[in-house]
Amino acid sequence: MKTSFLLLGLTLVLSSLNAQSAKEEVDFMQSVFGMGKKALVAEFVKPGAAQKDAFWQLYDEYEMARKELGKKRIELLLKYEENFDNLSNELAAVLLKEIQALTMKNDKLVASYVKKVSKATDPVVAMQFHQIEMYLLSEIRISIASSLPYPEIKQ
C-alpha cells in the first residue's frame, strides 16, 4: 500500500517535470521513495541479529547504485516525452536500445547484490531480498509503462 502511494506520487511528479527542475525533483522523490522503500523492505527481509548490520550495509550500497540507474531511466523518460510528437524511427531505435541496456543493468545489479547478500547473510535472506526487490521493480515498471503514451507509426 505504501509503495502504491509512493509510485502514484512519483508518477504525478514525473508527469509535471520540466527540464530545469527535473534533477531536484528526481532527487527529492528518490529520497522520499527510498525512506519508504527501506521501511517496506524491513517488513519483508528478516536477517538474524548477527546478520543485520551486514545486510543493511549491502542494502544501502545497492540503493545508491539503483538510484543512479533510476536517474538515467527518468532522463530517458523525459527524452521520450519531449520528443513524443516528433518521434522518428531513428530516435525510437536509440531510446529502445538505451532502455533495454538500462533494464539489463538493473537486473544485473539485483543479481549481483543477491549473491552478496547470500554470502554475507544466508540464502533465505537473499531470497527475501530478491523477492521484494523483484516485486517493487515490477510494480514500478508496470506503473511507468501504463502511464506512457503509446507510440504510433507516423505516415
Q: Where on the chain are the PLM-derived regions?
A:
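Intrinsically disordered, low-complexity segments enriched in polar/charged small residues
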Residues: 7, 17-19, 42, 71, ...
